[in-house]
Amino acid sequence: MTRTVIFALMAIIGSAGASAQAFADFVDLGTAGNFAVLAATTVTNTGPSVIDGGNIGLSPGTEVTGFPPGVLSPPYAFHVADAVAAQARNDLITAYAYAAGLVPALDLTGQDLGGMTLTPGVYSFDSSAQLTGTLTLDAQGDPNALFVFQMGSTLTTASNSSVVTINGGAEPGCNVYWQVGSSATLGTGTNFQGHILALTSITMNTNANILYGSVLAINGAVTLDSNQITNCVVPEASSMTLSLIGGGLLMGM
């Protein structure tokens, strides 16, 4: 199953890459945007996690554990091995490939995101990405400012790290996307923003939180531990006017 998905992604990326720069107003999650948590194998929770603003989904796996004590806020629902979850996973695969095919404005390989202030754009890491401390995303007065981060392998945050958006809209993390080539791990006490689209798995350690975003794993598991995730409404394409020309580092470490 995993090999088939990877081959499908390669085909989609190849077709998307040539046109991505022209149409990159936002990353369309499709029906995956209705999920705060989406995984393929298992969703496992420990402690009093609170999931709000989206469904919890699993496909093709069948094991969701830890709810309760975890809470899924109404009116959102669990979709386990059903047609809704399967379609969301298919849409996630398409969104992941689209994000991976965007042309990056700046290569940050080998640099820690902590201490940086970045403007809207697409940023890439050939392999892993690390966040230690605070990453500031400056939307420069544009409520629809788009930030895309492409990682060849892992995304890891140190304990008590944070992503902060300034000069943006009321729900700033809604247009921040993290395309992770393998797995993502949010360290204890991390305060994060944006949608994590991981090819494999996502782990949120104790008291790591996502304000305005989601955790979406294509082939693996999502593991939670006393977390809060608040998803947001993904904007329609017709309401977006952002161009991806640009992107830059305002202030380094």
Short names for language-model regions:
Residues 1-22, 248-249:
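Sec-dependent, cleavable N-terminal signal peptides
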Residues 12, 16, 235-236, 240:
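Intrinsic disorder/low-complexity segments
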Residues 20-233:
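Solvent-exposed adhesion/ligand-recognition segments of exported proteins
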Residues 236-253:
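A short, hydrophobic C-terminal helix/tail in secreted or cell-surface proteins
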